[in-house]
Design a protein with these regions (language model features):
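Short hydrophobic transmembrane-like helices used for membrane targeting/insertion
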Residues: 1-2, 11, 23, 41-42, ...
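PRPP-dependent phosphoribosyltransferase catalytic core
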Residues: 38, 43-61, 186-231
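Short glycine-rich phosphate-binding loop at a beta-alpha junction
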Residues: 112-121, 199
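N-terminal amphipathic/hydrophobic targeting modules at extreme N-termini
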Residues: 6-17, 22-26, 34-36
């Protein structure tokens, strides 16, 4: 078999037609420019997450799976005709990534590098945000605030990377009285952190927002009772 050898023009023509550059071919500036242009075209077709679609789908899932109708007693002691069980959402394989991305977008204007809250409601929310940040090529640490300090080991109340001297976000799935996020915020401040805000997935409109304001904490939420069809 006789192999036909190509000159520089032939090699360039074959490469530009879509094949790999020939072995031994020295890349010129124009070649590099062509390669970068192709890379830009390819990456432009990699769709970024559509936050509006994420939010809409998350709302759909919350309405379908998390709202329980019937008489229930809330943590405040008051009775309600419904209950929003968001752990069915934050621990769900489809919904959790949506929670992470939507909560990140909700707090995108805030400066913080760690997120956490009082166990248990805050834990999956914070972890979802950690994974959403990692998927975006960013780092976000998570911390867990125990309901009481350990009586053994290091006897620490906050688990995870140190938050001393750091700006942190307190999260919760939902809050009725605001007690859990406030307790977590106090623990974080005692550990040397600066709390930038409190953020939840759903606001029940039962006074938590007012409690946060009294404590000097900014507060934001993804969904209101109107969004959930409960008001």
């Amino acid at each position: 078999m006789i192999e036909k050898r190509l000159g520089p023009q032939g090699m360039a023509k074959r490469w530009k037609s879509g094949s790999e550059p020939p072995v031994g071919h020295t890349l010129r500036g124009s070649d590099l420019g062509t390669g970068l242009a192709r890379l830009a075209v390819v990456t432009s077709h990699i769709a970024a997450p559509d936050i509006d679609a994420d939010r809409a789908r998350l709302l759909e899932i919350v309405k379908d799976r998390a709202i329980v109708h019937g008489k229930v007693t809330l943590s405040s002691g008051k009775e309600a005709d419904y209950y929003v069980e968001l752990r069915r959402i934050t621990l769900d394989g489809e919904a959790a990534p949506l929670v992470g991305r939507v909560m990140r977008e909700l707090t995108d204007d805030l400066e913080f590098d760690a997120v956490g809250g009082l166990t248990l409601g805050a834990d999956p929310v914070a972890t979802a945000m950690l994974h959403a940040a990692a998927a975006a090529g960013e780092r976000l640490d998570v911390f867990v605030v125990r309901k009481a300090g350990k009586a053994h080991g290091l006897q620490q109340r906050i688990e995870g990377p140190s938050i001393r001297g750091r700006r942190v976000l307190i999260v919760e799935d939902t809050s009725t009285t605001g007690a859990s996020p406030l307790e977590a915020a106090t623990a974080a401040q005692e550990a040397g952190a600066t709390v930038v805000a409190v953020a939840t997935i759903a606001d029940r409109a039962t006074g938590a927002g007012e409690k946060f304001a009294e404590a000097g904490l900014a507060y934001r939420h993804v969904f209101s009772l109107i969004d959930l069809g409960l008001a």
